Amino acid sequence: MEKIIIYGGTGYIGKFMVRASLSFSHPTFIYARPLTPDSTPSSVQLREEFRSMGVTIIEGEMEEHEKMVSVLRQVDVVISALSVPMYPSQLLIIDAIKAAGNIKRFLPSEFGSEEDRIKPLPPFESVLEKKRIIRRAIEAAELPYTYVSANCFGAYFVNYLLHPSPHPNRDDDIVIYGTGETKFVLNYEEDIAKYTIKVACDPRCCNRIVIYRPPKNIISQNELISLWEAKSGLSFKKVHMPDEQLVRLSQELPQPQNIPVSILHSIFVKGDLMSYEMRKDDIEASNLYPELEFTSIDGLLDLFISGRAPPPTLAEFE
């Protein structure tokens, strides 16, 4: 059973990765910054919870090269779930992997758009370029890799688009970006994590791009809103934000506030997630493991109705 270390294992998607790794009985490690007096109680509690579940937490800085090399020599697979501001520090992970010499697979922090095949508005493009730099560095170092394009984090975007609550009791406005007809892919974070742990240890996925595009999870904003209205019993006022307004906001808002609107434009107006055909050497994740299945969008919304969905959060861009 492969030993897996997760960088960013206490972050939003990283927490799901850690739990998924444990669920498949992998010896699981986290490399994390040391706690400080300013650390939140929830951060302390999460580390205590993970330790009680058997996770080995190594505290250290990204610049501690020798420490990272020593830790990496104890594991087989490296998964980075670092947030956008930490993307460049993955070059330090690559250096440590090269020095360790034993890592069977590296999965960089991706899990969103397939960056080599789209060109969004400049603020989001600058984020994707940071990811491309990491990809090219991995390839130049000839490290065994898997690139995961997981598309939209399902609970994150349901929270963002529909702002639901466990027991909705009031009507609210819902913003529709563009016409609302553009198709995108919505995958529950728990499933993204489970498939990621599986592909990280699957020889078929070595040096390949794995795309999480289950046909049943391709949907438009209008379809998602209709499904939520039927399920919640509520009727929402729809407010359209046209293409031109998103473009203008991406130009006028300061950094990093211009990044989220550029992402919204990419996904919900341009349709970048569905803008390319799968190549013959791509792997579509939902075909890989008969014992696993992606949660349907209907099932995802049920989590919100029952109050079992992850709470709202916002991505960090600086």
Swiss-Prot record:
Spans through the membrane: none
One Gene Ontology term of the molecular function aspect: oxidoreductase activity
Effect on the protein of changing S83P: Confers some eugenol synthase activity. High eugenol synthase activity
One Gene Ontology biological process: phenylpropanoid biosynthetic process
Site for Required for activity, residues: I263
Catalytic function, reaction form: (E)-isoeugenol + acetate + NADP(+) = (E)-coniferyl acetate + NADPH
Effect of substituting P88S: Confers eugenol synthase activity. High eugenol synthase activity
Pathway given in the UniProt record: Aromatic compound metabolism; phenylpropanoid biosynthesis
UniProt-listed Enzyme Commission number(s): 1.1.1.319
UniProt keyword terms in alphabetical order: NADP, Nucleotide-binding, Oxidoreductase, Phenylpropanoid metabolism
Binding-site residues for substrate, renumbered to this chain: P260
Binding, NADP(+): 10-13, 32-43, 84-86, 109-111, 131, 151-153
CDD domains named among the record's database cross-references: PCBER_SDR_a (cd05259)
Top-level EC class as recorded in UniProt: oxidoreductase
InterPro entries found in the cross-reference section: NAD(P)-bd_dom_sf, NmrA-like, NmrA-type/Isoflavone_red_sf, PCBER-like
Entry annotation: catalytic residues: K131 (proton donor/acceptor)
Tissue: Mostly expressed in petals, and, to a lower extent, in sepals, stamens and pistils.
Pfam families: NmrA (PF05368)
Site (Confers substrate specificity): V84, Y87
Family: Belongs to the NmrA-type oxidoreductase family.
Record's function text: Catalyzes the synthesis of the phenylpropene isoeugenol from coniferyl acetate. Phenylpropenes are the primary constituents of various essential plant oils. They are produced as antimicrobial and antianimal compounds, or as floral attractants of pollinators. Isoeugenol is a characteristic aromatic constituent of spices and a floral volatile compound.
Protein name as catalogued: Isoeugenol synthase 1
Native source species: Clarkia breweri (Fairy fans)
